[in-house]
From Swiss-Prot:
Residues 235-259, 532-629 are annotated as: Disordered. Residues 243-259, 532-545 have a biased composition (Polar residues). It comes from Arabidopsis thaliana. The lineage of its organism: Eukaryota, Viridiplantae, Streptophyta, Embryophyta, Tracheophyta. May be not required for the accumulation of phytic acid in seeds. Phytic acid is the primary storage form of phosphorus in cereal grains and other plant seeds. InterPro entries: P-loop_NTPase. Disruption phenotype: No visible phenotype under normal growth conditions and normal levels of phytic acid in seeds. This is P-loop NTPase domain-containing protein LPA1 homolog 2.
């Protein structure tokens, strides 16, 4: 009788040396969605994570298939044979007679046991690494990254991401997308904590708690606040000058004369800080509970003042803070239109617009605190870029935390490690914004190098790629390029964890700067045996991307009283030049927004898989993978620029003609352009949602411009 393969729905990963008497205390049960989220956490693209997780379950089902009967009382277990060619060799079906009667009364429990496979940690990691290799993922140490991601997913470690920022900067949207990307199900807003606290206090008893942060200063006593600040300032001056009669006289005179009231902007900041201090105590207790349970969480809110965040980091080592802001005031103001009842920017009908000066003042204050404490600042004009930057920075901090580094420096009251990791990510993204990655291998050599290729096809930088030894441990090639000419044997495209941000994991000191001409290499070329690897030297491209310079004043005392001194001279700048980046870079960033695919949930990738089978063959799917092809971009950019100018002139001439000519002539123009669009329309039918990166300029010109032109002629009809 023919037996059918076991259906695998669960993979139980058991630690080495864990026996059956532990009742699975050290084991963890993986499903496909859980494994997919784990792969996304370590930097795999969402669609690749979906397919890799499916591949892992297929490998386990195919390599360890056996016929299990309904009477089986325990899960099947994988055993690795010594000297086997594959990491999963056979599946042993363990039957325990004592559990048969007990499981008969639980039909679902019997089904779950039949579809569950127990594997050791080493075998599980080997299978996943093999699946990653099939999808051309190359990392500095993927095995360590996978183990780290598994520890986070299995709640053996935790991370707490704090998104600070004022109202309207996109913290809520960013936290939701970031939670989906990291696989974190707990996303908390400080507004919800404040709302919970309001249920214990009446509005008349505590009007400060019931006010919004941007006008909480209206509920403070200006005289009391001014006197309190004057006393703190005098106390600090007294401590710095020393105790002497002249200093005491000076301080006494200053105390009597510095009773003038604070400005409106300073009162707005004081009200914001007062309400934040009320909320931060409850947040402190919540973070303590989350860390005890090793539960990862994303916290966002305006109440995360950087002064109090530094105090939280002294107690909670899992915190990774970020400062989210909007540099462009006009775009910040436009975000508040959707919050009004009538979609208006009228201050009389939109309270956010009414208090926009207070909101911007609080943002400037937070940005100053972020620079002082070296907290990474995220200009959230492009949501996709912000999520990718935070994701790569968080995982980079987890890597460094695994090595024993402390994210918070108690001596300087700064987070220089997080800032350094963030600057590395920005530098990597800037370095590789126009680069292409391929793994190259020279003729007669077993060593492989990951090469960063420029747009003209020259190799700007190479890194030795780690190979896997007989014991399946990464072996890093330490031999460097000597600059001599070699024949290029192989060149294949690769995927990096976190995309272009992933290059930050490769040490810069281990890279070579020897470049060679590989203009004719394309992404689909595997064998190029006669290609020569020129020793023509070109220096690596240096990073000119946005990076936050180290502040001169790094020694900061962490008390709130010390931070009050800088608030006395606080004033809002007339322009946002100190907060904004380069105009060209800012305009480029603001083009992007939330991508259609970036908001997809894990379940929606089942539909994507169906689309893959319906519209694409295996060859087309392989060619459409997001690997970077070796195409000369210079010629392409020149052609696209010329075509764009020509299309613009044609569209303008057609528009002027169609506005004055009769209907019959418009019909002739419409049919003519529809005929020209025939080939382009047939090609466009094969396009998918995730092929947005394909340039619109092709053999027949700009598809986008032609479509607009067709719509324009249709409107004339």
């Amino acid at each position: 009788m023919m037996t059918e393969a076991t259906k695998v729905l669960y993979i139980v990963v058991r630690e080495e040396g864990d026996d059956d008497d532990n009742n699975g205390d050290d084991s963890f049960r993986y499903t496909r969605p859980v494994l997919q989220s784990t792969l996304q956490l370590m930097g795999c693209k969402a669609r690749h994570a979906f397919k890799i997780s499916r591949r892992v379950f297929e490998l386990i089902r195919s390599e360890g298939s056996c016929n299990t009967s309904p009477e089986n009382g325990k899960e099947p277990e994988f055993a690795k044979e010594v000297g086997g060619s594959t990491c999963v060799e056979k599946l042993n079906c363990l039957v325990v007679a004592g559990d048969v009667d007990k499981n008969k009364s639980k039909p679902f429990e019997m089904y779950k046991r039949r579809t569950t496979v127990v594997v050791s940690r080493e075998i599980f990691v080997d299978v996943v690494c093999d699946a990653l290799a099939e999808y051309k993922y190359v990392g500095r140490d993927q095995r360590a990254d996978l183990i780290l991601a598994c520890r986070i997913r299995e709640r053996k470690e935790s991370v707490t991401v704090l998104l600070c920022g004022t109202s309207g900067c996109g913290k809520s949207t960013l936290s939701a997308l970031l939670g989906s990307r990291l696989g974190i199900t707990t996303v908390v807003s400080t507004d919800s904590i404040r709302h919970m606290m309001r249920s214990f206090a009446d509005e008349k008893q505590n009007p400060l708690l019931w006010a919004s942060t941007y006008h909480a200063g209206e509920y403070l006593d200006p005289v009391a606040v001014a006197e309190s600040k004057a006393k703190r300032k005098a106390k600090k001056l007294k401590g710095s000058r020393g105790v002497n009669s002249n200093a005491q006289k000076t301080d006494a005179g200053s105390n009597s004369s510095t009773t003038e009231l604070l400005s409106h902007k300073q009162m707005a900041i004081e009200g914001y800080k007062a309400q934040s201090e009320m909320v931060i105590d409850s947040l402190d207790r919540l973070i303590t509970t989350w860390e005890e349970r090793n539960e990862s969480v994303v916290v966002e809110g305006v109440h995360l003042s950087l002064n109090f965040v530094m105090g939280l980091m002294k107690k909670h080592p899992s915190i990774v803070p970020f400062m989210v802001y909007i540099a462009n005031e006009e775009k910040h103001l436009e975000r508040f239109a959707v919050r009004a009842k009538y979609m208006t920017l009228d201050p009389a009908k939109n309270k956010y617009v009414k208090y926009i000066r207070n909101i911007r003042t609080i943002q400037d204050y937070l940005c100053k605190r972020a620079d002082k404490h070296l907290v990474p600042k995220i200009n959230n004009t492009n949501v996709d870029k912000s999520v990718a930057t935070i994701h790569a920075t968080v995982f980079g901090c987890l890597r460094r935390r695994e090595t024993g580094e402390k994210l918070y420096d108690t001596t300087t009251n700064t987070v220089s490690v997080i800032d350094d990791e963030h600057r590395n990510q920005c530098a990597a993204n800037s370095l590789t914004s126009k680069g292409m990655f391929q793994v190259i291998q020279r003729q007669g050599s077993s060593r492989r190098f990951m090469a960063l290729c420029n747009t003209d096809g020259t190799v700007a930088k190479t890194w030795p790629v780690a190979s896997v030894g007989k014991i399946r441990k990464p072996v890093v090639n330490t031999e460097m390029d000597d600059g001599t000419e070699h024949q290029l044997h192989k060149a294949e495209p690769v995927n990096l964890q976190f995309g272009h941000f992933g290059i930050s994991a490769w040490p810069s000191d281990g890279a070579t700067s020897h470049a060679g001409s590989v203009d004719d290499l394309r992404a689909d070329i595997i064998e190029t045996g006669s290609r020569h690897y020129s020793s023509c030297c070109s220096s690596p491209r240096t990073s000119d991307g946005p990076s936050k310079e180290l502040m001169e004043e790094q020694s900061v005392n962490g008390s709130d009283e010390d931070d009050e001194e800088g608030d006395d001279d606080f004033h809002e700048p007339d322009s946002d030049e100190d907060l904004s980046d380069n105009n060209d870079e800012r305009n480029r960033d603001e083009i992007g927004s939330v991508d259609e695919e970036s908001t997809k949930s894990d379940e929606e990738y089942d539909d994507l898989a169906m689309e893959d089978k319906s519209y694409w063959t295996d060859n087309e799917e392989e060619e459409s993978r997001d690997t970077i092809s070796m195409v000369s971009q210079n010629n392409h950019n020149e052609a696209s620029k010329t075509n764009k100018d020509d299309k613009y002139s044609q569209n303008l001439d057609l528009f002027l003609k169609t506005t004055n000519q009769p209907l019959t002539e418009s019909l002739e123009l419409t049919s003519e352009y529809r005929n020209r669009m025939g080939v382009a329309a047939s090609d466009k039918a094969k396009m998918r949602k995730r092929s947005l990166s394909i340039p619109p300029v092709g053999k027949h010109g700009s598809i986008i411009d032609d479509q607009i032109l067709a719509n324009q002629t249709d409107s004339v009809l």
